[in-house]
Each structure stands twice: as structure tokens, then as C-alpha cells.
């Protein structure tokens, strides 16, 4: 089990700032969806560094991203 970022879509859509996307060090992990005006996380790419949480919660005081625990997918043996 490990932690990944999870965006609260409705709260994020209120701000439309995209700062978390700019600060995420992992390419194509944290993206912005124009149709909902909010960020979204590609869980398989998230390394759990929490930089996005720091930017959103501590710097901007918006609290739209939190870390959630996930379990890795079971790999099938061939």
C-alpha cells in the first residue's frame, strides 16, 4: 500500500489556478481538465511526493488535494 494525490474536483474547480500541475515533478502525472476546470491525477504515475498538497494547502490555503492510500494492482502470472 502507498499514498497518491487525490484532487477534490468540485473544490478545485472553484479556483482554476493550475499551480499544482506546474509544480508536480512527475511528467503527465497531475493534469488539468478544461471541461471541469479542475486538476486530476494519473494514479499510476503519482510518486506520493506531496508537493502538490504543499502548494495547494500550505502555500495557497485551498485544501483541494489530499493524499489517499491505494493498494497496487495484482500482477497476473503468465
Swiss-Prot record:
Subunit field text: Heterotetramer of one alpha, one beta, one delta and one gamma chain.
InterPro entries, alphabetized: 4Fe4S_Fe-S-bd
Residues holding [4Fe-4S] cluster 2: 24, 46, 49, 52
Signal peptide range in chain numbering: none
E.C. designation(s): 1.-.-.-
EC category: oxidoreductase
Domain 4Fe-4S ferredoxin-type positions: 3-35, 37-66
Gene3D superfamilies the record matches: 3.30.70.20
Cofactor note: Binds 2 [4Fe-4S] clusters.
Alphabetized GO MF terms: 4 iron, 4 sulfur cluster binding; metal ion binding; oxidoreductase activity
Protein name per Swiss-Prot or TrEMBL: Ferredoxin oxidoreductase 2 subunit ForD
Keyword terms: 4Fe-4S, Electron transport, Iron, Iron-sulfur, Metal-binding, Oxidoreductase, Repeat, Transport
Binding-site residues for [4Fe-4S] cluster 1, renumbered to this chain: 12, 17, 20, 56
Cofactor(s) the protein needs: [4Fe-4S] cluster
